[in-house]
Amino acid sequence: MFALGILPALLVLYLRRSVPESPVFEQRTRTGARRGVMETMRGRWKLLAYMIVTMAVFNAFSHGSQDVYPTFLKLQMHFDTHVTSLLTIILNLGALVGGLVFGQWSEKIGRRRAMAIACVLALPAIPLWSYGGSVLLLAIGAFWIQIAVQGAWGVVPGYLNELSPDDVRGTLPGFAYQLGNLLVSWTAFAMTWVAHANGGNYAIVQSVWIAIVAVLLAILTWFGPEAHGAKFGVTPETGDATMRGSPAVAD
Protein backbone atom coordinates (compact mmCIF):
# COMPACT_ATOMS: atom_id res chain seq x y z
CA MET A 1 0.00 0.00 0.00
CA PHE A 2 2.84 2.38 0.78
CA ALA A 3 4.41 1.65 -2.61
CA LEU A 4 1.10 2.22 -4.40
CA GLY A 5 0.76 5.51 -2.54
CA ILE A 6 3.71 6.82 -4.53
CA LEU A 7 1.74 6.78 -7.77
CA PRO A 8 -0.79 9.54 -6.93
CA ALA A 9 2.10 11.66 -5.67
CA LEU A 10 3.56 11.62 -9.17
CA LEU A 11 0.60 13.73 -10.28
CA VAL A 12 2.44 16.64 -8.71
CA LEU A 13 4.85 16.58 -11.65
CA TYR A 14 1.94 16.91 -14.08
CA LEU A 15 0.31 19.66 -12.04
CA ARG A 16 3.55 21.61 -11.83
CA ARG A 17 4.05 21.43 -15.58
CA SER A 18 0.52 21.74 -16.96
CA VAL A 19 -1.66 23.65 -14.49
CA PRO A 20 -1.23 27.44 -14.66
CA GLU A 21 -0.78 29.63 -11.61
CA SER A 22 -3.74 31.71 -10.51
CA PRO A 23 -4.20 35.16 -12.11
CA VAL A 24 -3.81 36.77 -8.67
CA PHE A 25 -0.45 35.08 -8.10
CA GLU A 26 0.76 36.02 -11.58
CA GLN A 27 -0.28 39.64 -11.11
CA ARG A 28 1.43 39.96 -7.73
CA THR A 29 4.58 38.33 -9.10
CA ARG A 30 4.74 40.82 -11.97
CA THR A 31 4.21 43.84 -9.75
CA GLY A 32 6.40 42.60 -6.94
CA ALA A 33 3.69 43.61 -4.46
CA ARG A 34 4.35 41.16 -1.65
CA ARG A 35 4.61 41.64 2.10
CA GLY A 36 6.13 39.41 4.74
CA VAL A 37 4.07 37.24 7.07
CA MET A 38 4.60 39.41 10.14
CA GLU A 39 3.73 42.60 8.29
CA THR A 40 0.64 41.05 6.71
CA MET A 41 -0.62 39.63 9.99
CA ARG A 42 -0.17 42.84 11.96
CA GLY A 43 -3.51 43.56 13.59
CA ARG A 44 -4.88 40.16 12.54
CA TRP A 45 -3.61 37.92 15.35
CA LYS A 46 -7.09 37.48 16.78
CA LEU A 47 -8.21 36.18 13.39
CA LEU A 48 -5.31 33.70 13.39
CA ALA A 49 -6.21 32.54 16.90
CA TYR A 50 -9.83 32.06 15.85
CA MET A 51 -8.80 30.03 12.81
CA ILE A 52 -6.54 27.76 14.88
CA VAL A 53 -9.14 27.17 17.60
CA THR A 54 -11.85 26.53 15.01
CA MET A 55 -9.65 24.04 13.15
CA ALA A 56 -8.89 22.29 16.44
CA VAL A 57 -12.60 21.84 17.13
CA PHE A 58 -13.22 20.83 13.51
CA ASN A 59 -10.59 18.09 13.80
CA ALA A 60 -12.08 16.94 17.10
CA PHE A 61 -15.39 16.72 15.22
CA SER A 62 -14.10 14.60 12.36
CA HIS A 63 -11.64 12.38 14.24
CA GLY A 64 -14.10 11.93 17.09
CA SER A 65 -16.73 10.62 14.69
CA GLN A 66 -14.44 8.39 12.63
CA ASP A 67 -11.29 7.13 14.33
CA VAL A 68 -12.73 4.88 17.04
CA TYR A 69 -15.96 3.96 15.23
CA PRO A 70 -14.54 0.72 13.73
CA THR A 71 -13.27 -0.19 17.21
CA PHE A 72 -16.75 0.43 18.61
CA LEU A 73 -18.26 -1.81 15.94
CA LYS A 74 -15.80 -4.64 16.61
CA LEU A 75 -15.39 -4.57 20.39
CA GLN A 76 -18.76 -3.35 21.61
CA MET A 77 -21.12 -4.45 18.84
CA HIS A 78 -19.09 -7.63 18.11
CA PHE A 79 -19.42 -7.27 14.35
CA ASP A 80 -17.04 -9.16 12.11
CA THR A 81 -14.59 -7.50 9.73
CA HIS A 82 -17.02 -7.67 6.80
CA VAL A 83 -19.82 -5.79 8.58
CA THR A 84 -17.37 -3.31 10.12
CA SER A 85 -15.90 -2.57 6.69
CA LEU A 86 -19.36 -2.21 5.15
CA LEU A 87 -20.47 0.31 7.77
CA THR A 88 -17.20 2.21 7.40
CA ILE A 89 -17.73 2.43 3.64
CA ILE A 90 -21.29 3.69 4.15
CA LEU A 91 -19.95 6.24 6.63
CA ASN A 92 -17.50 7.55 4.04
CA LEU A 93 -20.18 7.72 1.36
CA GLY A 94 -22.12 10.00 3.69
CA ALA A 95 -19.01 12.14 4.02
CA LEU A 96 -18.81 12.54 0.24
CA VAL A 97 -22.46 13.54 -0.01
CA GLY A 98 -22.20 16.01 2.86
CA GLY A 99 -19.09 17.71 1.52
CA LEU A 100 -20.63 18.22 -1.91
CA VAL A 101 -24.04 19.38 -0.71
CA PHE A 102 -23.01 21.78 2.04
CA GLY A 103 -20.05 23.13 0.09
CA GLN A 104 -22.37 24.14 -2.73
CA TRP A 105 -25.12 25.30 -0.37
CA SER A 106 -22.70 27.64 1.39
CA GLU A 107 -22.42 29.62 -1.85
CA LYS A 108 -26.06 30.62 -1.36
CA ILE A 109 -26.51 30.94 2.40
CA GLY A 110 -23.00 31.86 3.54
CA ARG A 111 -20.10 29.87 4.94
CA ARG A 112 -20.70 30.10 8.67
CA ARG A 113 -24.43 29.53 8.40
CA ALA A 114 -23.87 26.35 6.37
CA MET A 115 -21.25 25.08 8.84
CA ALA A 116 -23.42 25.81 11.87
CA ILE A 117 -26.44 24.07 10.33
CA ALA A 118 -24.32 21.01 9.51
CA CYS A 119 -23.08 20.85 13.10
CA VAL A 120 -26.61 20.99 14.50
CA LEU A 121 -27.70 18.32 12.00
CA ALA A 122 -25.24 15.90 13.63
CA LEU A 123 -27.06 15.96 16.98
CA PRO A 124 -30.22 14.00 16.06
CA ALA A 125 -28.05 11.41 14.26
CA ILE A 126 -26.20 10.41 17.44
CA PRO A 127 -28.78 7.89 18.78
CA LEU A 128 -28.81 5.91 15.52
CA TRP A 129 -25.04 6.25 15.06
CA SER A 130 -24.22 4.85 18.52
CA TYR A 131 -27.34 2.99 19.68
CA GLY A 132 -29.01 1.83 16.48
CA GLY A 133 -28.54 -1.80 17.49
CA SER A 134 -29.09 -3.33 14.05
CA VAL A 135 -26.78 -3.05 11.07
CA LEU A 136 -29.44 -1.14 9.12
CA LEU A 137 -30.02 1.51 11.79
CA LEU A 138 -26.31 1.91 12.49
CA ALA A 139 -25.73 2.33 8.75
CA ILE A 140 -28.36 5.08 8.60
CA GLY A 141 -26.80 6.78 11.61
CA ALA A 142 -23.27 6.52 10.25
CA PHE A 143 -24.30 7.87 6.85
CA TRP A 144 -26.29 10.70 8.44
CA ILE A 145 -23.67 11.83 10.91
CA GLN A 146 -20.97 11.98 8.25
CA ILE A 147 -23.22 14.05 6.01
CA ALA A 148 -23.21 16.53 8.89
CA VAL A 149 -19.54 16.26 9.89
CA GLN A 150 -18.06 16.38 6.42
CA GLY A 151 -20.79 18.75 5.29
CA ALA A 152 -19.32 21.26 7.70
CA TRP A 153 -15.82 20.35 6.53
CA GLY A 154 -16.83 20.83 2.90
CA VAL A 155 -17.15 24.56 3.57
CA VAL A 156 -13.78 24.91 5.32
CA PRO A 157 -11.44 25.38 2.31
CA GLY A 158 -13.42 28.28 0.89
CA TYR A 159 -14.00 29.74 4.35
CA LEU A 160 -10.32 29.78 5.35
CA ASN A 161 -9.16 31.10 2.00
CA GLU A 162 -11.66 33.95 2.09
CA LEU A 163 -10.56 34.91 5.60
CA SER A 164 -6.86 34.88 4.70
CA PRO A 165 -5.11 38.03 3.40
CA ASP A 166 -3.64 37.70 -0.10
CA ASP A 167 0.01 37.67 0.97
CA VAL A 168 -0.43 34.67 3.30
CA ARG A 169 -3.24 32.81 1.56
CA GLY A 170 -0.84 30.07 0.50
CA THR A 171 0.38 29.65 4.09
CA LEU A 172 -2.28 30.64 6.61
CA PRO A 173 -5.09 28.13 5.90
CA GLY A 174 -2.72 25.15 5.98
CA PHE A 175 -0.88 26.44 9.04
CA ALA A 176 -4.11 26.99 10.97
CA TYR A 177 -5.39 23.56 9.96
CA GLN A 178 -2.21 21.69 10.90
CA LEU A 179 -1.76 23.48 14.22
CA GLY A 180 -5.41 22.92 15.08
CA ASN A 181 -5.03 19.26 14.20
CA LEU A 182 -1.95 19.03 16.41
CA LEU A 183 -3.84 20.48 19.37
CA VAL A 184 -6.43 17.68 19.27
CA SER A 185 -4.19 14.85 18.05
CA TRP A 186 -4.95 13.06 21.32
CA THR A 187 -8.64 12.64 20.42
CA ALA A 188 -8.65 8.91 19.61
CA PHE A 189 -6.37 8.09 22.56
CA ALA A 190 -8.56 10.03 24.98
CA MET A 191 -11.79 8.47 23.72
CA THR A 192 -10.31 4.97 23.90
CA TRP A 193 -8.95 5.54 27.41
CA VAL A 194 -12.28 6.85 28.72
CA ALA A 195 -14.14 3.97 27.06
CA HIS A 196 -11.83 1.42 28.70
CA ALA A 197 -12.29 3.16 32.04
CA ASN A 198 -16.05 2.71 31.61
CA GLY A 199 -16.08 -0.98 30.83
CA GLY A 200 -15.51 -0.65 27.09
CA ASN A 201 -18.57 1.53 26.56
CA TYR A 202 -17.54 3.30 23.36
CA ALA A 203 -21.12 4.29 22.55
CA ILE A 204 -21.55 6.70 25.44
CA VAL A 205 -18.06 8.17 25.02
CA GLN A 206 -18.41 8.93 21.31
CA SER A 207 -21.97 10.20 21.80
CA VAL A 208 -21.04 12.68 24.52
CA TRP A 209 -17.90 13.72 22.64
CA ILE A 210 -19.68 14.49 19.39
CA ALA A 211 -22.60 16.22 21.11
CA ILE A 212 -20.28 18.60 22.97
CA VAL A 213 -18.04 19.25 19.98
CA ALA A 214 -20.96 19.79 17.59
CA VAL A 215 -22.55 22.40 19.87
CA LEU A 216 -19.22 24.16 20.47
CA LEU A 217 -18.42 24.23 16.75
CA ALA A 218 -21.89 25.50 15.85
CA ILE A 219 -21.38 28.41 18.26
CA LEU A 220 -17.87 29.15 16.98
CA THR A 221 -18.91 29.22 13.34
CA TRP A 222 -22.24 31.00 13.85
CA PHE A 223 -20.66 33.89 15.73
CA GLY A 224 -17.30 33.82 13.97
CA PRO A 225 -16.00 36.08 11.21
CA GLU A 226 -17.01 35.75 7.57
CA ALA A 227 -15.61 37.14 4.35
CA HIS A 228 -17.99 35.38 1.95
CA GLY A 229 -17.43 36.61 -1.58
CA ALA A 230 -14.02 38.14 -0.82
CA LYS A 231 -12.24 39.21 -4.00
CA PHE A 232 -8.82 37.61 -4.20
CA GLY A 233 -6.16 40.07 -5.20
CA VAL A 234 -7.79 42.86 -3.20
CA THR A 235 -6.39 42.53 0.32
CA PRO A 236 -9.02 43.70 2.83
CA GLU A 237 -8.16 46.00 5.65
CA THR A 238 -8.12 44.61 9.17
CA GLY A 239 -11.65 43.99 10.37
CA ASP A 240 -13.19 43.42 6.94
CA ALA A 241 -13.76 39.82 8.01
CA THR A 242 -16.55 40.70 10.39
CA MET A 243 -18.56 39.03 13.09
CA ARG A 244 -22.15 37.92 12.68
CA GLY A 245 -24.59 40.81 12.68
CA SER A 246 -22.26 43.32 11.06
CA PRO A 247 -23.84 45.17 8.13
CA ALA A 248 -20.64 44.51 6.16
CA VAL A 249 -21.45 40.80 5.95
CA ALA A 250 -24.04 39.41 3.60
CA ASP A 251 -25.81 36.70 5.57
Regions found by a protein language model. Name each.
Residues 166-198:
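A late C-terminal transmembrane helix in Major Facilitator Superfamily
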Residues 98-110:
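Helix-to-loop junctions at the C-terminal end of transmembrane segments
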